[in-house]
């Protein structure tokens, strides 16, 4: 306000209110961002958003200056998607900061933002971010259609919007991706996806989302491809162990003992002797205890939660075996399942429910029950779509070109094209013949 009070042009001028408003806007205010607003509803919205509104008697409009909006969390290392090598900055609760973090990764004039307000009471700002010319325009139209149909009082977090716009609300699998790391969101936008940013949450939604994304880590692209491929294969194996290990143990120990080698069968029979519960009840009971410990570890403060998870699992497991309530083989199987499930945080929720389904069918139909649920699971996954994109691509429909970034991660110079199921206008993302071997051979010929 000091420049306004000391400026002699304002004291001596005979300008009308609107002309005085333009003079102040163009010559006096030193704020980085100033815009003129002529609608009272827009003025109220800017005030509630933390902006500074400048009104002059006799002027038909108002000047809005973007303020700090109060205290906010600084850019920190996100607790999810942790990496050993790679960027460590994460999104915050401020949408302006999150847009800036993405712009640092994508210094591209085609970077486009579309803004809308959702929530009758909360008036939450939502932005659709995409790269024009890379993303399919039909995808943006579909996102706008689904967002504009949301009529609710409040939007507090991205999970609200995710449940409104997902393709299969009754499915165990999420058809909308999310991340709190700018590098992940930028990489997905470069493949032809769109990002949905919501003010008040560090989690950014990305669509379309594929099943294969759950097995991909950002660190896979920052380390050498051989080790990245090995780790990715381990994640697939861990997922199968996480949903099938207890069920296979229940089926074999209850219905198919002939499949167990004789020495191992005698050992298992000795360990299970005197156990009052059938193996299916053991698996369900230990699974329930594991979920309780996992939930307690998440809700408690981090140092205390880790201690409760580790000590609680050791004490309860040892006590259950000593009391003769649970067999030691089942404790080993459940412990292996728990460790395997931690390798895929994105599928933790679906793994827990699938594990229970497999155990129940294994306890009634044996291996045939496991096969029945597994086939139903494959059919369900093949039927899912995410904003028109097959959820199982590039596996179904099969695309040999895109298999370079599924079970294994090929070198960057070999991944020339964007995903076939997602890319639209510009499928090629780099030039051919970027292999170091080709470059070295070409340099040798040049020297000769």
Residue spans of the language-model regions?
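Membrane-embedded alpha-helical signal segments
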Residues: 1-244, 248, 258, 262, ...
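Generic detector of multi-pass transmembrane helix bundles and their immediately adjacent loops
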Residues: 248, 261-448
């Amino acid at each position: 306000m000091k420049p306004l009070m000391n400026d002699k042009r304002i004291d001596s001028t005979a300008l009308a209110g609107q002309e005085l408003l333009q003079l102040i806007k163009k010559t006096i205010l030193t704020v980085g961002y100033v815009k003129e607003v002529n609608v009272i509803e827009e003025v109220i919205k800017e005030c509630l958003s933390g902006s500074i509104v400048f009104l002059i008697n006799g002027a038909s409009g108002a000047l809005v200056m973007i303020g700090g909006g109060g205290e906010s969390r600084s850019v920190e290392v996100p607790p999810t998607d942790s990496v050993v090598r790679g960027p460590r900055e994460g999104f915050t609760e401020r949408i302006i900061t999150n847009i800036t973090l993405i712009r640092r990764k994508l210094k591209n004039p085609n970077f486009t933002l579309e803004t809308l307000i959702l929530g009758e009471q909360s008036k939450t700002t939502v932005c659709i971010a995409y790269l024009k010319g890379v993303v399919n325009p039909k995808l943006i139209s579909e996102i706008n259609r689904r967002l504009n149909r949301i009529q609710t009082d409040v939007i507090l977090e991205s999970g609200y919007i995710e449940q409104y716009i997902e393709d299969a609300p009754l499915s165990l699998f999420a058809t909308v991706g999310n991340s709190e790391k700018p590098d992940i969101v930028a990489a997905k936008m470069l493949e032809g996806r769109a990002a949905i940013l919501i003010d008040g949450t560090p989690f950014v939604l990305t669509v379309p989302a594929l099943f294969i994304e759950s097995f991909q880590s950002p660190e896979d692209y920052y380390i050498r491809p051989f080790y990245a491929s090995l780790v990715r294969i381990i994640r697939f194996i861990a997922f199968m162990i996480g949903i099938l290990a207890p069920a296979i143990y229940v089926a074999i120990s209850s219905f198919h003992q002939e499949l167990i080698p004789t020495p191992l069968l005698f050992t298992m029979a000795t360990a299970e002797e005197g156990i009052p519960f059938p193996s299916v009840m053991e698996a369900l009971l230990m699974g329930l205890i594991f979920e309780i410990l996992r939930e307690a570890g998440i809700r408690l403060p981090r140092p205390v939660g880790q201690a409760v998870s580790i000590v609680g699992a050791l004490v309860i497991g040892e006590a259950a075996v000593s009391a003769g309530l649970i067999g030691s083989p089942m404790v080993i199987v459940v412990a292996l399942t728990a460790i395997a499930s931690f390798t895929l945080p994105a599928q933790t929720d679906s793994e827990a429910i699938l594990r229970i389904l497999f155990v129940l069918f294994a306890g009634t139909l044996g291996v045939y029950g496991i096969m029945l649920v597994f086939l139903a699971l494959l059919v369900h996954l093949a039927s899912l779509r995410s904003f028109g994109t097959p959820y199982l691509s590039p596996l179904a429909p099969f695309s040999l070109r895109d298999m370079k970034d599924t079970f294994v991660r090929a070198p960057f110079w070999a991944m020339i094209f964007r995903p076939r199921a997602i890319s639209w206008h510009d499928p090629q993302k780099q030039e051919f013949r970027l292999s170091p071997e080709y470059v070295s051979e070409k340099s040798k010929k040049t020297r000769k």
